[in-house]
């Protein structure tokens, strides 16, 4: 396995990622984001993550759900596709409990993670999908709050409290990037 390296992502790096659509672009050339977000406990996460992703200029949002969450998402953003299909990036875990069997909807959401693990496109992991961090082949960005990061690190035999992470987030971000 190749040694993992980390570097600082700058505003200049971000600017190079922004592509202004031209008259020859279409939804597929502008990117298709697969979303596995929201749950019965946190349905708003599905709606907010989908509408926020569409506001970026993304070509298509593909919401993966086997529950009533799709109706909420479609009510807010009818342009969302709610059928499985190819994606160019993933966002997973927001609004999903980290315990797979906490409720039936969460169990179903975790089953969708199997699809994510079979692909190699860039992936953003949050909340309930953080257990996949460091286990995927694809480029991965994690977005935990301090409590989620403490739980993730503890699952990797690193003892740290959320208060310690909040007191020195830069150090813990660096340590996490080296660990994962």
Language model regions located:
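Small-residue (G/A/S/T)-rich helix-start motifs and N-terminal tracts that mark the onset
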Residues: 1-127, 131-141, 146, 150-180
């Amino acid at each position: 396995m190749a040694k993992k390296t980390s570097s600082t992502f700058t505003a200049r790096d971000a600017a190079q990622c922004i592509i202004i659509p031209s008259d020859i672009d279409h939804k597929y050339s502008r990117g298709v984001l697969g979303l596995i977000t929201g749950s019965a406990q946190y349905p708003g996460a599905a709606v907010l993550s989908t509408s926020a992703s569409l506001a970026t200029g993304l070509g298509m949002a593909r919401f993966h759900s086997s529950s009533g969450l799709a109706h909420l998402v479609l009510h807010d953003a009818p342009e969302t596709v709610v059928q499985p299909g190819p994606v160019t990036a993933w966002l997973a875990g927001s609004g999903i409990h980290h315990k797979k069997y906490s409720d039936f909807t969460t169990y179903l959401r975790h089953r969708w993670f199997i699809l994510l693990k079979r692909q190699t496109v860039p992936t953003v992991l949050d909340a309930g999908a953080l257990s996949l961090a460091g286990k995927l082949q694809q480029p991965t960005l994690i977005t935990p709050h301090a409590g989620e990061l403490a739980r993730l690190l503890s699952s990797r035999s690193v003892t740290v409290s959320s208060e310690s992470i909040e007191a020195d987030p830069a150090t813990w971000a660096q340590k996490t990037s080296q660990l994962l």
